[in-house]
Amino acid sequence: MSEHFEKRRPVFLQLGFNEAALPQLKAYLDLLWSSNEELNLISRKMTYEELIDNHVIDCLLPIKDFPKDVKVAADFGSGGGLPGVIYAIQFPNVEYHLFEKSKLKQDFLNRCVSIAPNLRIHGEIPPKLEKIEVVTSRAFKPVDVILEFSRDYYKKGGKYFLLKGRKEKIDEEVALARKKFKDLKVTVQPLSSPVLEVERHLVLI
């Protein structure tokens, strides 16, 4: 496992990951991998190499575009911590609130606090998000549902940093969201993986 992590080290750095935080990233991935058989945090059929190439690098693709000077962030549907834990490791000065309704996954995320002490773990997304400056998510819900979950935050000018896949699907989601949120302003940025031929986009609201 360590071999593939070291093999991808240049890619992590190329994408903008903090070299000093690589030991924490490795510790998180080892914990995620060792816990997966019991908790099913990611597909049990997935190899460690696929975990890095399909998930970790996926999360890092837009990391250079993460809003500057953010002090408090939230991640919706955090699951096994992709991207929430990775971003908390990358940005240790950001108080990162992870929202995950599964009790088992919450328990796992609480174990990650020893690796990234700036993490705060919660269950359901509350009606009002206090002090949050940006919301992240990956492979969670459609755009309109994410906005519905955080309607009060959105109305107050909240920012969203959403990792999505196919452009066609994104266009459908945005069209539906615009029916509910007439003033919705969206920017869709293509992302290019250096290790896989996959269609990825960053949705900024």
UniProtKB/Swiss-Prot annotation:
Binding locations of S-adenosyl-L-methionine: 77, 82, 100-102, 129-130, 138
Subcellular location: Cytoplasm
Keywords: Cytoplasm, Methyltransferase, rRNA processing, S-adenosyl-L-methionine, Transferase
GO molecular function, one term: rRNA (guanine-N7-)-methyltransferase activity
Primary subcellular site in the record, as a coarse category: cytoplasm
Gene Ontology CC terms, in alphabetical order: cytosol
Known catalytic reactions: guanosine(527) in 16S rRNA + S-adenosyl-L-methionine = N(7)-methylguanosine(527) in 16S rRNA + S-adenosyl-L-homocysteine
Biological role stated in the UniProt entry: Specifically methylates the N7 position of guanine in position 527 of 16S rRNA.
HAMAP family, per database record: 16SrRNA_methyltr_G
Name this protein carries in UniProt: Ribosomal RNA small subunit methyltransferase G 1
